[in-house]
Structures are given as structure tokens and as C-alpha cells.
């Protein structure tokens, strides 16, 4: 049922040699980045563990429940990616204002970002209200559609809480304050685990809601995290001088436009990448319940691994933004290379875990032998794309800190939708490789993005050093 483990010692040796070389030259920047990134990574890991827990609970409830939650979660993430990406502009601008010692401008900027977050939440709610009626049009197996629709009808009520939480989180990260993200992430996990279990299986006096229970638990955690974060910022002495909630401001469209000019290309870039995975999930739904369940197992593990380079990339964005605000280009470049060294190291570790322990990982999700066999094969593909996935994420973070967002958006479109998706469709459907073909498309798209974004970083940094705008 399971594949033999390959000998990858040579590849590991090359990766560790590369990391050692970069650290020897830029090691002084590795430690500050790690200190800033660690709470972010742990916060992201807690988010990934939430997905892991939900999938384990759904998978042991039934294969249909897991498949329905997979489709529902995929369609939930589609609108969530836009506010996640767009509001990153707040981190970029706050870090640069902080670096330039213009803190009096941070409070007004934050209040306008809250208006933008509410607007994005309204868009998200509208999408999640409409899309359940369109599920039959996607060609998904009919058994999955009712559960996915119920899940989406429930989770839409968290549409406002989600962007507000990220708005507050990105503000904190721009101010080099990353511990709230970690604490709220694990706090949400502690609430979600027992609540989702109770609502899905009907334990502790609750009725058995099945996949709807997963949605109810998710919405509850979204609102708890948003409310607690708001209370923290309101009461925190660290940010008292910024007067974040000193008064209510009407929307200032000029400031909101500034946020959108930087953030919308980031949001579209993230949508391009996330959309590739989401559409891949919907297309694999055509191959049957076993294929989609196996895909979700492999994807959730890959997403958990992805949380590490994501946290490192966000920390790198903040540090580069701070350096740009101080006009310190040498530090900017050193911070970027330190980020690459860290990511190569983390992705080597992630790939090693997947290659060595895929059978143990799959066993934690399901005891269905057919699903387990398919998932174990897909986890090997997940191990392969750890490197391009981490490197493209880090390059994106570096470019965001440099306020270069529009060209990376175009490069993301080319990589994911000009290369990855067409190849995945050809291999998955034309050659009938099913989910394996679609995953090869993912690997090609991520590899292209890693190469193109790395090239873009080189071009932009050389222009900045030459004084070319």
C-alpha cells in the first residue's frame, strides 16, 4: 500500500551546505528574523493545526463528511484570500512609518484599514451566500454537495470577523509585535478542538450536526479571536500613544486607495496561488469521494508545513519595510538573504518529515485503506514542492517589503494559471492521471513562481542600489 522511502541524503547535504554558506555571510540578520518570525510561525502552525484537527474529526466521522468539508473549506478560502492579501498592505505601510519614526500617522492609517476590512467582509459574505447554489455546476459528486452547502451557509457568518482580525494582526506585525498572533492562534485551537468534536459527533449534550458542526465551531472561533484582539489593542499600554480607537473617523477614500494600491495586487497574487489549489480541489472532486478525501489529507499536511515559510516571509517583510523606511539598502539586502537561508533550512526539514513519515501521517487521518493508499502517494508530491513553495513565498514577502507588488502579481498569474493549471488539466484529465496529474501541475506552477519572483527580487534590488525608481 505504501511506497518505499527514497534515499535523499545527497539532496539534504546540498541544502545544508547552501544554508551554511549564506549564514556565514549574513548570519547577523538570521537571529533577528528568527526572533520576529517564531511567534508568527507558531501562530500559523496553530492555524494549520486547526485545519488538521477539523480534517481528522471529519475523516473519522465519515469519508463523505471529510469530502464535503474539503469542498466547503476550499470555497471558503477563495474569498478569504482576498482580504488576507489586500490587508497585508497595512503591515508594509506601518513598518515603513515605524522605521521612518512617523508614528503619528499610524493611528489614522489603522482606522481607515478597519473600514477597508469591513468592506472586504461584506464582499466575502455576499460570495459565501451565493456560491452554495452554484455547487452542482462544478460537477462535484452529488453525495458531497448537500454537506458542502450546509457548511458554507454556516461559515459565512464569520465574514466580518475574519478581515477585522487580520487587520489588527497585520497592524501588530508592522509594529514588530508578533506574540498576540501566536497566543490567539493557540487560544483558538484550544476552543475549536472540543467544540468541533462536540458539535460534529453530538457529545457533551450537543446535537450531532456533522459537517455543520465544523462550520459552527469555526465561526465561533473567528469571532472570539477578533473580539479578544480588539480588547487587547484597546487596553494595551504599548500602543496607547498611537490612539488607535481614540475616535471614530469617516472613510477617507484617499487613504483607502493608498492601501488598495499596494494591497490589491498582493491580494490578487495570493488569490492566484490559493485559487490554483482551490480550483485543483474542485476539479479533483470530479474523480470521486476517495480521491478528494486523499487529496485533502495531503493538502492539509502540505498547508501545515507551509505555515513555517509563511511566518518567515512575513517577518522578512516587516524587517525589509523597516529598513526601506530608514533608507538602509545594505541591511535590506542582508535581511532578504537571511530569509532565504532560513527558508531553505525549514523546507529541508519539512520535506524530510514527509518523506520519512508519510505512512504515520496518513494513519492519523483515516483508516480507510483506499484513501490511505492514495494519500500516501500524494504526500510524496507534497514533499517535492516544499522547496519551490517556500522560496516563492519568501520572494513574495521580500518584494512586498520593497513595495513591489504589481509585477509579482503578473508573474503569479503566468506561473499558476499560464503553466500550472494547464499542465495539471492535461495530465489529470487528458492523460487520466487523476489527482497525481493535478499535483504535478501544482509543482510546476510553484517552481515557475519561485524562479520568476527570485529573478524579480534581483532586478528590483539592483535598481534600488543604482538609485533607479
Curated annotation (Swiss-Prot):
Any single GO CC term annotated in Swiss-Prot or TrEMBL for this entry: plasma membrane
Molecular-function GO term, any one: antiporter activity
Membrane disposition: Multi-pass membrane protein
GO biological processes: monoatomic ion transport
Coiled coil: none
Keywords: Antiport, Cell inner membrane, Cell membrane, Ion transport, Membrane, Transmembrane, Transmembrane helix, Transport
Localisation: Cell inner membrane
Transmembrane regions listed in the UniProt entry: 10-30, 34-54, 74-94, 121-141, 179-199, 214-234, 264-284, 292-312, 335-355, 369-389, 409-429, 437-457
InterPro entries in UniProt: MATE_fam, MATE_MdtK
Main location: membrane
NCBIfam families registered for this protein in UniProt: matE (TIGR00797)
Function noted in UniProt: Multidrug efflux pump.
Similarity remark: Belongs to the multi antimicrobial extrusion (MATE) (TC 2.A.66.1) family.
Protein name: Probable multidrug resistance protein NorM
Species annotation: Xylella fastidiosa (strain Temecula1 / ATCC 700964)
Amino acid at each position: 500500500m505504501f511506497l518505499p522511502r527514497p534515499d535523499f541524503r545527497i539532496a539534504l547535504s546540498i541544502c545544508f551546505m547552501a544554508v551554511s554558506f549564506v549564514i556565514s555571510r549574513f548570519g547577523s540578520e538570521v537571529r533577528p528574523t528568527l526572533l520576529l518570525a517564531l511567534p508568527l510561525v507558531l501562530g500559523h502552525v496553530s492555524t494549520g493545526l486547526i485545519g488538521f484537527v477539523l480534517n481528522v474529526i471529519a475523516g473519522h466521522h465519515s469519508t463523505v463528511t471529510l469530502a464535503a468539508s474539503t469542498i466547503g473549506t476550499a470555497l471558503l478560502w477563495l474569498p478569504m484570500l482576498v482580504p488576507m492579501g489586500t490587508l497585508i498592505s497595512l503591515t508594509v505601510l506601518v513598518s515603513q512609518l515605524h522605521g521612518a519614526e512617523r508614528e503619528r500617522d499610524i493611528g489614522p492609517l489603522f482606522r481607515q484599514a478597519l473600514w477597508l476590512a469591513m468592506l472586504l467582509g461584506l464582499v466575502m459574505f455576499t460570495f459565501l451566500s451565493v456560491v452554495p447554489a452554484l455547487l452542482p455546476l462544478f460537477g462535484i459528486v452529488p453525495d458531497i454537495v448537500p454537506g458542502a452547502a450546509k457548511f458554507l451557509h454556516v461559515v459565512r457568518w464569520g465574514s466580518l470577523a475574519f478581515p477585522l482580525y487580520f487587520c489588527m494582526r497585520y497592524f501588530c506585525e508592522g509594529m514588530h509585535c508578533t506574540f498576540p498572533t501566536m497566543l490567539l492562534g493557540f487560544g483558538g485551537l484550544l476552543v475549536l478542538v472540543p467544540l468541533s468534536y462536540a458539535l460534529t459527533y453530538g457529545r457533551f449534550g450537543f446535537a450531532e450536526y456533522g459537517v455543520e458542526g465544523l462550520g459552527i465551531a469555526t465561526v465561533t472561533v473567528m469571532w472570539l479571536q477578533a473580539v479578544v484582539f480588539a480588547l487587547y489593542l484597546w487596553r494595551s499600554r504599548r500602543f496607547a500613544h498611537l490612539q488607535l480607537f481614540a475616535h471614530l473617523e469617516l472613510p477617507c477614500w484617499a487613504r483607502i486607495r493608498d492601501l488598495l494600491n499596494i494591497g490589491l495586487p498582493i491580494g490578487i497574487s495570493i488569490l492566484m496561488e490559493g485559487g490554483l489549489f482551490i480550483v485543483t480541489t474542485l476539479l479533483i472532486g470530479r474523480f470521486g469521494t476517495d480521491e478528494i478525501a486523499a487529496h485533502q489529507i495531503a493538502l492539509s499536511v502540505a498547508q501545515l508545513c507551509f505555515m513555517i515559510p509563511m511566518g518567515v516571509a512575513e517577518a522578512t517583510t516587516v524587517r525589509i519595510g523597516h529598513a526601506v523606511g530608514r533608507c538602509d539598502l545594505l541591511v535590506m539586502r542582508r535581511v532578504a538573504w537571511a530569509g532565504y537561508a532560513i527558508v531553505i533550512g525549514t523546507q529541508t526539514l519539512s520535506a524530510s518529515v514527509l518523506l520519512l513519515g508519510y505512512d504515520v501521517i496518513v494513519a492519523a487521518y483515516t483508516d480507510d485503506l483506499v484513501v490511505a493508499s492514495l494519500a500516501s502517494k500524494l504526500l510524496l508530491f507534497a514533499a517535492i514542492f516544499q522547496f519551490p513553495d517556500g522560496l516563492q513565498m519568501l520572494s513574495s514577502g521580500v518584494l512586498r517589503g520593497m513595495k513591489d507588488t504589481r509585477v509579482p502579481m503578473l508573474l503569479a498569474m503566468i506561473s499558476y494559471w499560464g503553466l500550472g493549471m494547464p499542465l495539471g488539466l492535461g495530465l489529470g484529465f487528458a492523460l487520466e492521471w487523476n489527482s497525481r496529474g493535478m499535483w504535478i501541475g501544482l509543482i510546476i506552477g510553484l517552481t515557475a513562481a519561485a524562479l520568476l519572483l527570485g529573478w524579480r527580487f534581483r532586478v528590483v534590488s539592483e535598481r534600488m542600489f543604482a538609485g533607479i525608481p
